[in-house]
Amino acid sequence: MPKIANSGDGSGLMRTPEVAGKIVTAVKQAVSVPVTVKCRLGWDKGSINVLDFTKRMEDCGADMITVHGRTRSMLYSGTADWEMIRKVKAQCRVPVIANGDIVDGPSAVRCLHWTGADGLMIGRATFGDPWVFTEVRAALKGEPVPPRPPLAARVDTA
């Protein structure tokens, strides 16, 4: 969301990792539930700082980190960089969740295999297609994909 990011919040915190770290530390001290962080690769291709950022978040107490494999300036264009997610996973002790370009069962399997992530976050692929979760679950278990509901059921869901 441009209004949020441009005011220094959301993905805008990638530009001020020290502030993001202070937020994680404060939240961690204030709550008794796990504290998670979601970030992108960086603000733009000239400021990719996800490795330093996620290390700092982990050091400040984050219990899990989700990485969207694009920069803020990419928004949802281009291809998610699963290699960078793999690098984050390699350096983190906390669970890492991969996000970006997971659109169906086969892409979910490829993403987990490539990144070594502990889990997946599916975003835009769910818009108008909540059955994608059934497809992904089947693919991850190596099972056949169940048929989609009949058109009438899909229309009712919409």
Briefly describe each language-model feature range.
Residues 1, 35, 39-45, 69-73, ...:
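Active-site-proximal loop/turn and secondary-structure-junction residues that shape catalytic pockets
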